Each structure stands twice: as structure tokens, then as C-alpha cells.
């Protein structure tokens, strides 16, 4: 395949970001929809500007070339991308193939720094995006806050431990969390639990996962009594996990924002 660089790649990626925001919007609840709608509008405006009111489909057709876009996305987005968003985008844009690689945002940041040939980076937190931008590896004018997520406490279906609120994580005998060293969900978990005075009390019960999907899978398999993931993760396994509660208001210093941007070629 032929890989595009510069403005052409930028416009295709921005059109993709706008479409993916719109696709995610369809599956959100009302409050999330309002947040995502604003992000969709921002991404769409950026896409229209960069593309000079063309679409990725028209651009590709005009050149007659096949284009492959590699998206490096947070592990919590894998199901949404693979099951819905990528097929939706490819159907609307013949000649453009989208491949995804998924891991914790911290690990993806490191991979991009070490030469991963990604076209688009979608992080589960602003920290990793800011770091890459400061290193000159991101097209700064393409950074868009695309989605807002929620941090939730989950338990296996049945809730045998009878947890009722976020703070009840203390009652669990085994807990799955993302590793705060590289997993944004783990960083959010540490912050919330520290602010609630719980973090130090549960350390001997915690198993740390290398990405949020590992945490979700541990709870879904009942290998852990409880875990902390994103609301979107919990929704993807609603038949195997239950949401006990969202992180309490004030326990996190900022909203859980997923930024997206084009990686410099």
C-alpha cells in the first residue's frame, strides 16, 4: 500500500476522528452524549478545515491510491474500534484501510517515541498526549478532546460481596487495578482512592494489570472481587460485570478525557 504523509494524511485522519466521535455518540447515555456532541462538532470543524470541505473518500478516489491508516488507541477503545468504528469508516471511505493497535496509553506513548509508525494516537488521558506534543511528535493543531469517560467500580455479575458504593472496594478480598505507572485508568484509580483515604489500605489485595482490558477480564472471570475500569469497558461486558458506582464527585481533579491527534510522519 502507499502511505500518505503531510496534509493529505492529516485531512483523512481528521475526517476519521469526526466520524468516530459521531459513531461513539450513538452508544452513549444522555450526559455523555452532550459531551461527545461538542467534541464531535469540534472534530468535524477541524476536519472540514483541513480537508477544505472534501472527504477522505473523495481524496482517495481522486488519487486512485490505496491508503492504510494505523491507529494507536487506548486498550479501553478496542471493542468500539474493531466492532463498529473502523468498519463504519472503511465502508464510508473505499480505498482507506484502518488498522488498530491497542495497549495502555503509557505503553503506546513509549512505542511512538521508539518509532511506532502510527498515524493517529488516541489516549485515555491528556498526560500522554501532552508529553508527545512537547516532544514534537504530534501535529499540535490536530489535537482534539474527543470523548469523556467515567471511572467506575465493577464487580462480577451477582455482586457476592454486596458492594454498594465506590468506597466499598475496601470490602473486597481481591482487587484488580491498572498499573499507575503506565495505565491511565490505574492513575485515575490511585488518585480517587488516595483522595478517599483508601489507597494505602488495599495494597495487599491488589493485582495490577498492564492495561485496563486485563482488569476488566479479571473481574469478568471472577478472578478478582472488584476492579476499577472505564464505564465504556463495563458496558462492553454488561453480561459478566456489574457497575457498583462511579468515582465520587471531587475524588478526581479533572475529567477523564480522551484526546486524539495525528502523529507526525
Language-model segment annotations:
Residues 119-123:
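Periplasmic-binding protein-like
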Residues 29-47, 51-52, 56-92, 103-106, ...:
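Exported/periplasmic ABC-transporter solute-binding proteins
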Residues 1-7:
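Short, Lys/Arg-enriched N-terminal segments with co-localized hydrophobic residues
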Residues 142-151:
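Short, glycine-/small- and polar/acidic-enriched structural segments
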Residues 10-17:
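Sec-dependent signal peptide recognition
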Residues 23-27:
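C-terminal motif of bacterial Sec signal peptides marking the signal peptidase cleavage site
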Amino acid at each position: 500500500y502507499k502511505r500518505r504523509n503531510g496534509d493529505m494524511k492529516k485531512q483523512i485522519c481528521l475526517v476519521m476522528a469526526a466520524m468516530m466521535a459521531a459513531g461513539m455518540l450513538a452508544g452513549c447515555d444522555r450526559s455523555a452524549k452532550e459531551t461527545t456532541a461538542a467534541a464531535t462538532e469540534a472534530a468535524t470543524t477541524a476536519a472540514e478545515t483541513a480537508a477544505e470541505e472534501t472527504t477522505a473518500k473523495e481524496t482517495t478516489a481522486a488519487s486512485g491510491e490505496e491508503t492504510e491508516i494505523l491507529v494507536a488507541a487506548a486498550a479501553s477503545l478496542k471493542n468500539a474500534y474493531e466492532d463498529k468504528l473502523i468498519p463504519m469508516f472503511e465502508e464510508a471511505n473505499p480505498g482507506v484501510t484502518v488498522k488498530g493497535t491497542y495497549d495502555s496509553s503509557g505503553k503506546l506513548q513509549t512505542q511512538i517515541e521508539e518509532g511506532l509508525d502510527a498515524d493517529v494516537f488516541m489516549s485515555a488521558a491528556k498526560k500522554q498526549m501532552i508529553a508527545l506534543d512537547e516532544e514534537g511528535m504530534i501535529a499540535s493543531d490536530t489535537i482534539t478532546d474527543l470523548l469523556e469517560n467515567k471511572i467506575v467500580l465493577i464487580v462480577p455479575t451477582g455482586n457476592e460481596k454486596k458492594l454498594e458504593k465506590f468506597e466499598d472496594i475496601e470490602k473486597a478480598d481481591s482487587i484488580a487495578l491498572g498499573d499507575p505507572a503506565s495505565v491511565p485508568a490505574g492513575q485515575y484509580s490511585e488518585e480517587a482512592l488516595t483522595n478517599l483515604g483508601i489507597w494505602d489500605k488495599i495494597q495487599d489485595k491488589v493485582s495490577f494489570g498492564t492495561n485496563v482490558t486485563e482488569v476488566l477480564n479479571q473481574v469478568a472471570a471472577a478472578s478478582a472481587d472488584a476492579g476499577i475500569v472505564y464505564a465504556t469497558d463495563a458496558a462492553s461486558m454488561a453480561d459478566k460485570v456489574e457497575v457498583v458506582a462511579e468515582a465520587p464527585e471531587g475524588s478526581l481533579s479533572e475529567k477523564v478525557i480522551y484526546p486524539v491527534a495525528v502523529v507526525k510522519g
